[in-house]
C-alpha cells in the first residue's frame, strides 16, 4: 500500500510519545494531585509553557529537516489551536448547564483530553491511510470543510443546551445516574446502587464534543501536510494546551464575538486549498500568513467591539 513520506523515524516517534506520557504524569500526579480551582495566573503559566514547548519543537523540526516541515508544523499547530478555541465555548456551556463546580473541572478535562489523544491518533492514522490509497478523498475533505465553515458562520449565534441533546438523553436512559456530586468521583453509591455523578455526564459530553471538532481539525491539517509525524505532533501539542487555555479564557469567551467568523473563514480557506491542491501549489508560508491574518483580524475586531460595548456584572459568564 502506498504511504506518504515522513520525517518521523521510530526513535522520534518513541521519544515524542514518551514525552507526552511524562508530561501527563507530571500534570496529574504532581501539579494537580489535589483538586483545586485553577486560577487565571496558573492557567496563563501553563498555557505559556505549552506554547513555548510547541514552538521549540517546531524550531527543532525546522533545524533538523528544513523550513518546509517546520512551517508545516507551525501552520498545523495554529489551525488546531484556533479551532480548539471553539471547543472552549462548548466546554463553558457544558460546565454551566451541568453546574460542575470549578474545583472539579480540571479533572473532567484531564480525562476527557486523555481519551481525546488516543482518539486523535486513531483518526489521524486512519486519515493518512485513506488518503494514501484514495487520493480523491482530498476533494471530499475540502468540500466538507467549506460546508462546515459556511455552517459555522450561519450558526455563529446559535446556543445549544447540552442537557437537551440526544447524547445526554441516551446516557441518562442507559446509565443509572444521580444529580448529586460525590467529591471528584465519577461514580457514587446511593442506597446500595452504583450511580454516575454529573462529572461522568460532563465527561461524556466533553469527549463527544472533541469527536465532532476532530472531524473539522484533522482534515484541515491534511491541507497543510500529509506527513503523519507532523500532523500527529502538531495536533497533540495543541490538544495538550487546551485545558490551560480553557481556564485562561473561560471567563472571557463572550468578548471574542467575531472569533467564529474568523474560524469559519479559516475553514473555507483550508477547504478551498484542499480542493485546488492538484492545480495550485500554495507555499507553506502563504498558508500560514493567510490563516494568521484571518484569526488576527477576528480577534482584533472582537477586542475593539468589546471595548466599546457596555458591560455589567450581570452579563458576565458564569463557569
Curated annotation (Swiss-Prot):
The chain crosses the membrane at residues 11-31, 43-63, 83-103, 108-128, 134-154, 195-215, 220-240, 260-280, 284-304. Coiled coil: none annotated. Signal peptide: none annotated. The keyword Cell membrane applies. It comes from the Bacteria. It is a multi-pass membrane protein. Keywords: Cell membrane, Membrane, Transmembrane, Transmembrane helix. It is found in: Cell membrane. The keyword Heme does not apply. GO terms for cellular component: plasma membrane. Belongs to the TerC family. This is Uncharacterized membrane protein STKORF319. It comes from Myxococcus xanthus.
